[in-house]
Amino acid sequence: MFDGAPDLEFRAATKALELEHSALSYQRVPPGYRFPYGHTHRQQEEVYVVVRGGGRMKIDDEVIELEEWDAVRVPPCTWRGYEAGPDGLEILVIGAPTLDMRGDVDGERGWWPE
């Protein structure tokens, strides 16, 4: 469970792998579920890799379709959010540099209202 998103499965691997300069997480989003808020990082760049399923991702004002094995780079200071399609969405998220999440991230509930 991720803070504020009880339907999202979130597994962080950064500490378990003792990563010093990057971060890694796995996220499983149930079918039709939209992450409840958008977020941005002040310094961290992220790459989202779809490992199963599909859906859509909103990057600033652009909405893109996601399919299995798509990879999307999101630079710092860019708002992002995602939603699962009918088969759900499983993603790996790689971020660099590793930062204190509380000090680097801003979030906004309802950022992608559609």
Language model feature labels by segment:
Residues 1-23, 30-31, 36-37, 102-114:
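A short, N-terminal "cap"/entry segment at the start of jelly-roll beta-barrel domains
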Residues 26-29, 40-58:
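Short, conserved beta-strand element in jelly-roll/cupin
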Residues 37, 57-58, 74, 80-86:
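Short beta-strand His + acidic residue motifs that chelate non-heme Fe in jelly-roll/DSBH
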Residues 43, 62, 78, 87-88, ...:
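A generic "binding-loop/recognition-motif" signal
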Residues 60, 68, 83-84, 103-104:
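Short glycine-/acidic-enriched loop or helix-start segments at secondary-structure transitions
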Residues 73, 86-103:
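A short hydrophobic beta-strand segment most commonly corresponding to one strand
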